[in-house]
Each structure stands twice: as C-alpha cells, then as structure tokens.
Amino acid sequence: GFVDLAKKVVGGIRNALGI
C-alpha cells in the first residue's frame, strides 16, 4: 500500500544519509 511505499522511501533516504 501507499504507507508501505512511503516507509520504503523514507527508509531509503535515511539510509542514504547514514542516519
């Protein structure tokens, strides 16, 4: 669903930032 997709996007961004 949209929520799962949003979580994946946020997780990817945080991972890219090294947070």
Curated annotation (Swiss-Prot):
Localization in the cell: Secreted
Quote the InterPro entries the UniProt record gives.
Answer: Aurein_antimicrobial_peptide
Keywords of the record, alphabetical order, are: Amphibian defense peptide, Antibiotic, Antimicrobial, Secreted
Name assigned to this protein = Uperin-2.2
List GO BP terms, alphabetically.
Answer: defense response to bacterium
Q: Which residues form the signal peptide?
A: none
User: Which Gene Ontology CC terms are recorded?
Assistant: extracellular region
Q: What is the recorded function of this protein according to its Swiss-Prot or TrEMBL entry?
A: Shows a weak antibacterial activity against B.cereus, E.coli, L.mesenteriodes, L.innocua, M.luteus, P.haemolytica, S.aureus and S.uberis.
Instruction: Tell me the tissue specificity.
Output: Expressed by the skin dorsal glands.
Q: Does the keyword Iron apply?
A: no
Asked if the keyword Cytoplasm belongs to this entry, the reply reads: no
- What organism is recorded for this protein? Uperoleia inundata
